[in-house]
């Protein structure tokens, strides 16, 4: 069974824990209890493949920012979450993205931009803005509601697909184009 290490990042109060708990336990937690760090595991089938999702739900609060480098090092893919009713959380996405790229020492890291709380009637972040940001980053954008479960599986599963593509690209990339992953020539039949 293939394991995927997913990390949920974003500002405090955007619904990172609510999204994660909705995926794992199928229920909505409406009271706000700031997370320091929680880890969850769930077995799912995505595109016919049985996967083990190892999900790290992180602290959005600034006082825990020192812990970020550590979990960013171990994560394979990142859900970058903002709340559609919180412009500051949207602006903060770039800070998280830059920190991830710095820690991973790569511009090519699997990520999905997630606009949470789409069930709320008032929004301060326009869908078009979010689509444009995601396009400029070259990553998918998905709107979610941890409350109604809209887009929740889609967000996590899309990230798994991004990680799969990244792994395939790494596996198929080589310096001179003739050597396979074991240092031997590959033959496609």
From Swiss-Prot:
Q: Does the keyword Hydrolase apply?
A: yes
Where in the cell? Cell membrane; Golgi apparatus membrane
Q: Where is this cross-link: Glycyl lysine isopeptide (Lys-Gly) (interchain with G-Cter in ubiquitin)?
A: 170
Q: Which gene encodes it?
A: NRAS
For this entry, the protein name equals GTPase NRas
For membrane topology, the record states:
Lipid-anchor
PTM statement from Swiss-Prot or TrEMBL: Palmitoylated by the ZDHHC9-GOLGA7 complex. Depalmitoylated by ABHD17A, ABHD17B and ABHD17C. A continuous cycle of de- and re-palmitoylation regulates rapid exchange between plasma membrane and Golgi.
This molecule's function is given as: Ras proteins bind GDP/GTP and possess intrinsic GTPase activity.
Which lineage is the organism of this entry classified under, starting from the top rank?
A: Eukaryota, Metazoa, Chordata, Craniata, Vertebrata
Q: What is its EC number?
A: 3.6.5.2
Record bears the keyword Acetylation? yes
Q: Which InterPro entries match?
A: P-loop_NTPase (IPR027417), Small_GTP-bd (IPR005225), Small_GTPase (IPR001806), Small_GTPase_Ras-type (IPR020849)
List the source organism: Cavia porcellus (Guinea pig)
